[in-house]
């Protein structure tokens, strides 16, 4: 009977949660420097994810005492982790077809370049959403256009990011 089916369960949703959790498990960051809370969309060409900045994060103490603002390097790191690393891990785990891009224990992503423009401040406790669209993934190098939005859906930052997968 259709009325007895649990609203929160659907085989596709369970499958996607497993994929997202597998990718999150492969992120090479510990909790104090992991800036990915949730992946809401993922394909071979695009990723959408979010992060909520903790009010007591270590970088707020000295970044404008009394009037803390999220440093641009942290905004850039959030964009890179969601927009480049998550998408790169997904491409590798799902067979990118590129030689030399297998994901093992001694493999880690490196940001090789970023060109970011900032439009709005991000304050402690704010939630941000990152959307990344792939330009290409060749020979272990991923290049994407990455945008960050605040909870009001205002553009916070936008940039072009490139990164590679390196063997340790």
Predicted regions, residues:
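N-terminal leader/capping segments at the start of a protein or of a new domain
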Residues: 1-41, 45-47
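Catalytic strand-loop segment that frames the active site of acyl-thioester-processing enzymes
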Residues: 28-70, 74-75
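HotDog/MaoC-like acyl-thioester-processing domains
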Residues: 2-16, 119-168
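Active-site- and interface-proximal helix/loop "cap" or "latch" segments in soluble metabolic
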Residues: 70, 75-89
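Hydrophobic beta-strand-centered segment that forms part of the acyl-chain substrate-binding groove
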Residues: 2, 8-17, 84-131
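Beta-strand-rich interaction surfaces with strong enrichment in secreted/lumenal proteins
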Residues: 24, 66-67, 117-120
């Amino acid at each position: 009977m259709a009325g007895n089916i649990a609203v929160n369960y659907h085989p596709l949703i369970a499958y996607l949660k497993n994929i997202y959790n597998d990718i999150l498990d492969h992120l090479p960051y510990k909790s104090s420097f992991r800036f990915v809370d949730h992946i809401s969309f993922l394909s071979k060409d695009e990723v959408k994810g979010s992060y909520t900045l903790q009010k007591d994060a270590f970088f707020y103490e000295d970044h404008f005492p009394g009037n803390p603002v999220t440093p641009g390097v942290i905004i850039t790191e959030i964009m890179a982790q969601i927009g480049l690393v998550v998408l790169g891990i997904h491409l590798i785990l799902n067979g990118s077809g590129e030689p030399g891009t297998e994901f093992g224990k001694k493999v880690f992503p490196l940001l090789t370049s970023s060109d970011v423009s900032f439009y709005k401040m991000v304050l402690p406790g704010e939630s941000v959403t990152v959307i990344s669209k792939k330009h290409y993934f060749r020979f272990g190098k991923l290049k994407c256009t990455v945008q960050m939005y605040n909870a009001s859906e205002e553009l916070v930052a936008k940039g072009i990011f490139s990164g590679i997968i390196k063997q340790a």
